[in-house]
């Protein structure tokens, strides 16, 4: 009887099976949570490292792209300068050919200037009776062994404008002055620059290339593709006496 009471007492003091299972279950959950947290941290660190790596690579690619773009811009500028230089050389070549043709034809001609040309000192001028764009006007003058008018001084400008008033009045006449839209320089056909007092008074802002023309007493500028009269010029034949 006494032993049964002791056994009952011991059995009552021992923990219940449910409580022990709960503790085991609680310990298992805590370990799983820690494992998940560790894996999450490792994954986040991996993402952060990958993001930094990709960011560095993107920066490198952007830098290379900017360098390539700068090189491309420089190459385009070099090509543009070469094209302008080639065009200038072609114009000077045509100018030299026209000068030689004029010299040869003058050797067989007794008068200082051809018919329908106006003489002023050492130059002969032809005032066209047709309209054309600037480049076509240039070609028409070359066919006559001359070039578009190149005004060297204010005295020559006064003679031209005075003669035009007597011939046709106030019209527009192309001269051999042009300005490229990229370089912005005014140049005569022989590659020389006009004197500051003979620069055009106004410029068309909408055109890629503008050319000079004479109207009344002024030297102005306009789109080279517009239609105007033109003035040719060549050297007068010197007397062989």
From Swiss-Prot:
Extracellular side: 57-241
Membrane topology classification: Single-pass type II membrane protein
Any one cellular-component term (Gene Ontology): cell surface
Record carries keyword ATP-binding: no
UniProt motif ITAM-like: location: 5-10
GO biological process, one term: positive regulation of cytokine production
SMART domains reported in the protein's UniProt record: CLECT
Ribonucleoprotein listed as a keyword: no
Cellular location(s): Membrane
C-type lectin domain residues: 120-233
Carbohydrate attachment residues: 81, 223
Disulfide bonds: 113-124, 141-232, 211-224
InterPro entries: C-type_lectin-like, C-type_lectin-like/link_sf, C-type_lectin_CS, CLEC9A, CTDL_fold, NKR-like_CTLD
Subunit-structure text: Homodimer.
This protein's name: C-type lectin domain family 9 member A
Species: Homo sapiens
């Amino acid at each position: 009887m006494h032993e049964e009471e002791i056994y009952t007492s011991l059995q009552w003091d021992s923990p219940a099976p449910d409580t022990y299972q709960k503790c085991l279950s609680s310990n298992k959950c805590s370990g799983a949570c820690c494992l998940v947290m560790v894996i999450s941290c490792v994954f986040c660190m991996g993402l952060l490292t990958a993001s930094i790596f990709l960011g560095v690579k993107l920066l490198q690619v952007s830098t290379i792209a900017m360098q390539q773009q700068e090189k491309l811009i420089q190459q385009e500028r070099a090509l543009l300068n070469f094209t302008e230089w080639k065009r200038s050389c072609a114009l000077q070549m045509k100018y030299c050919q026209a000068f030689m043709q004029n010299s040869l034809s003058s050797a067989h001609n007794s008068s200082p200037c051809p018919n329908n040309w106006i003489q002023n000192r050492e130059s002969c001028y032809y005032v066209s009776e047709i309209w054309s764009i600037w480049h076509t006007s240039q070609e028409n003058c070359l066919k006559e062994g001359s070039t578009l008018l190149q005004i060297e001084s204010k005295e020559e400008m006064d003679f031209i404008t005075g003669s035009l008033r007597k011939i046709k009045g106030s019209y527009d006449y192309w001269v051999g002055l042009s300005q490229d839209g990229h370089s912005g320089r005014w140049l005569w056909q022989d590659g020389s620059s006009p004197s500051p007092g003979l620069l055009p008074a106004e410029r068309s802002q909408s055109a890629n290339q503008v050319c000079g023309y004479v109207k009344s007493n002024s030297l102005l500028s306009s789109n080279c593709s517009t239609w105007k009269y033109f003035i040719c010029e060549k050297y007068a034949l010197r007397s062989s006496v």
